[in-house]
Structure formats: C-alpha cells, structure tokens
A protein has these predicted regions:
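Gly/Ala-rich beta-loop-alpha elbow adjacent to hydrolase catalytic centers
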Residues: 4-8, 12
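Short beta-strand/loop motif that positions the catalytic acidic residue
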Residues: 85-86, 92-94, 98
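Acidic catalytic loop of the alpha/beta-hydrolase fold
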Residues: 96-101, 128-129
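Active-site nucleophile elbow and catalytic-triad environment of alpha/beta-hydrolase enzymes
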Residues: 65-82, 88
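Hydrolase active-site cap/lid region
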Residues: 14-72
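Catalytic active-site module of serine/aspartate enzymes centered on a nucleophile-bearing elbow/loop
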Residues: 133-151
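Short alpha-helix in the alpha/beta-hydrolase fold that links the catalytic acid
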Residues: 79, 88, 102-111
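Catalytic histidine neighborhood in serine/cysteine hydrolases
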Residues: 110-128
Length: 151
C-alpha cells in the first residue's frame, strides 16, 4: 500500500508505473500534482502574478538549468507519465478549494491511470486539508477503498 499527501502523493503516483513489489496492492494519493513543470508554472502565475510572458520562457530556462544540474527536465517529473503505466487500484483525493495544487490536476491524473480508480473531491477543503476538514468522510472513503482492494 502506498499513501501520500501533496508531494508525497506525487511521489506515490510517480512510482505507480514502476515494477513495484507485489505487496503494493493499491495506491492512495491526496492532492498530488500532474508534473513539476505544471506546478511551477501554476505557482509563478498564482503566487507571483506573472503573465504568460515572461513566465513561459523563465520556466523553460529553469527546466534547462535543472537538466544540466541534476539530469532531467521539469516535465520529466511527471505523475501522468507513470499513471499511464499503472494497473493497481487508486484512490484520488483532492480539496475542491486547493489553490496550491489546483483541483483541475486531479482530473488529469485520474484520467491517466489504467487501473481501477475512485475519486473523491472534498468540496471546501484547501490544499492538504481534506482530512482536517472532513475527517469522517475521509476515513470512510479510505476505509471503503482499502476494504475493496487490500485484503
């Protein structure tokens, strides 16, 4: 069982398409992003109110520097690419008022996976606060998912 929140959720999704041990029967992700580049572009726009120009070329330059320094482009850090290879059951959880990792990203992630999947949007929850805002509903969704797919 893999379970992650925020960056941990993105990490869980990024491992989903790998050759994981058979003990990993299912994955739960809570508010993970689609890929690093999309998240940085979103933050530049929302936090810094940066317009498309110069945001686009700056993120591309940053991606190139990242490639030189650590060996990969920002787009390579992609949950979506790994989810295309996933065949394990997944529960996707996201806050409906998430401004840090926009809620729209969960729909892209959800559509990308090949395994059995469930989606729960915690309507009024901001980033990483679905459990804090809806503890009973959160527990119910997780418990039902685990009962279905993890024996």
């Amino acid at each position: 069982m893999l379970f992650g929140v925020s960056m941990g959720a993105a990490t869980a999704m990024m491992t989903s398409g790998l050759n994981l041990p058979k003990q990993v029967k299912a994955i739960i992700e809570d508010c993970g992003y689609t890929d690093v580049k999309d998240e940085i572009e979103h933050e530049a726009k929302v936090l810094y109110h940066m317009p498309a120009f110069p945001r686009f070329p700056l993120v591309e330059i940053l991606s190139g520097i990242n490639r030189i320094k650590v060996g990969y482009y920002l787009k390579d850090g992609s949950s979506v690419n790994q989810l295309h290879r996933n065949h394990r059951p997944m529960l996707f959880i996201h806050g409906g008022r998430d401004k840090f990792v926009p809620t729209r990203m969960v729909y892209t992630n959800y559509e990308a996976t090949k395994g059995k999947k469930e989606l729960w949007i915690a309507k009024k929850a901001p980033h990483a606060a679905s459990y804090a805002n809806y503890p009973q509903a959160y527990t119910k969704h997780v418990r039902n998912f685990l009962n279905k797919y993890v024996h």
